[in-house]
């Protein structure tokens, strides 16, 4: 049985920490694959979609989303996160106006980010199925079974109130 610690130890995932306000403590966990970190660095270095919808930059949008997630703030279902397809061991999407982040919940309040892309690119090229299948394939390759993947598809299954 693979554990989060095993995945971190073998470099399959890394923990993402974001600086929170002085009065905030992390109440959720956020991990990602090295490939996601590479994409995130591109965004943090100023990468932008062809047309931005949000008032904040994509980097600011991601920072705000990650801070909200890690600090335990309530996330708005369908606006800030949603299940890509209602199925066992579902793939989930974290959302901002300009960015989509795909991954899965390894446990309640513990998200693993695998793919990131611009909202318009995903919608224009209908990339949802490809990301969903890519995440399922990755979990198989890493020998991740149902003990490291939340089965539920409702917000209460993956996030504490």
Per-segment meaning from a language model:
Residues 1-98, 108, 119-161:
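Basic, Lys/Arg-enriched alpha-helical interface segments
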Residues 116:
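Active-site donor-binding loop signature of nucleotide-sugar glycosyltransferases
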Residues 102-113:
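Active-site beta-strand-loop-beta-strand hairpin of nuclease catalytic cores
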